[in-house]
Amino acid sequence: MLDNPMMKRCIGMGALGLALLSAVAVAADPASESGVYTGHDLVVHAQARTPDQTTAFYLGRGFPAAMLKEFNQSCFVTVSMRHTRPDVVWLEPARWRLRDANGRIIERRDRHYWNRVWKAINAPHASRATFGWTQLPESRDLQPDEPVGGNITIVPPTGPFSLEFRFATGKNKTGPEIVGRIEGLVCQAQESDMVTGNAP
């Protein structure tokens, strides 16, 4: 069981996690900010989360230890976007590519992956549902000025990596494709002390 000092730490980290994982980031000068793409009337923010941030967020929502341990085997990347184009922009993370510093593809762990994990460990259905709404939708037609945000999860790379995204446009996906890239993302590979029990 978690001791009192750890729980105090979790409460503070949980509040931080909520702000980090659910808010759409706003920057005065997004073109010069790390982890931001701007172009084609589109702004995309991406940030890899630390294990403590991820663990605190879900621990604060009552997730069991078995689920938290699974999160330590993945890197969570929070992505948010908004566009001001006159047409529809299609959010489809399956079309995105993540690459390590050597150009190798990094595996994205989609909802099918997590559903298999939750079934294997008999995760509570309420926690499964909560986890689901914190992930980016697998497909959504974004209307002008409609914000969206959530996480994608990947196999943790050992160094910097890039996110290349592709967006179809237009009601029937017949408009010009938008392609962009965010580089210099980094995942922390160590386990969260909140799960291992080493928190001060």
Residue ranges and their predicted role:
Residues 2-15:
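Bacterial N-terminal signal peptides that target proteins for export
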Residues 27-200:
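Conserved functional micro-motifs across diverse proteins
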Residues 13-23:
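Bacterial N-terminal signal peptides
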Residues 1-2, 108:
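Intrinsically disordered, low-complexity peptide-like regions
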